[in-house]
Design a protein with these regions (language model features):
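Asp-based, Mg2+/Mn2+-dependent phosphohydrolase catalytic module
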Residues: 1-111
Length: 111
């Protein structure tokens, strides 16, 4: 879709800043990757994390040591509108944030 909404992780971060206690089981946490991997019964070499978030999807895949594909038409799309080299754009995003991953593959959309 065209609209981008805050993720549950964003809401948890805000809640924690207000003094609330959180326990996140989701990307980029290793628990969710372990859960999915244990259900799959395949080697890590056959797993590909597809996502639009350098912070959650790609970083999580990097931590779990699986390949990843970044879809640039998602939450970071405003950065990828330019005709710059995608890796240069990712470096610029990395300079502004912690916990960002490096994708193995990049494409605009899944078709």
């Amino acid at each position: 879709g065209e609209k981008i909404y805050p993720s549950t992780g964003d809401l948890a971060i805000q809640y924690k800043k207000l003094g609330g206690k959180t326990h996140i089981i989701g990307k980029p946490g290793i628990e969710i990757f372990n859960f999915a991997y244990n259900k799959a019964s395949v080697s890590r070499e056959k797993v590909l994390m597809i996502g639009d978030s350098l912070f959650n999807d790609i970083y999580g895949a990097n931590q779990f040591k699986i390949d990843s594909l970044l879809v640039t038409s998602g939450i970071h799309k405003e950065f990828f509108i330019s005709n710059k080299d995608p890796l240069e754009i990712i470096d610029n995003i990395h300079s502004d944030y912690q916990n960002t991953g490096i994708p193995n593959y990049i494409m605009e959309k899944l078709k």
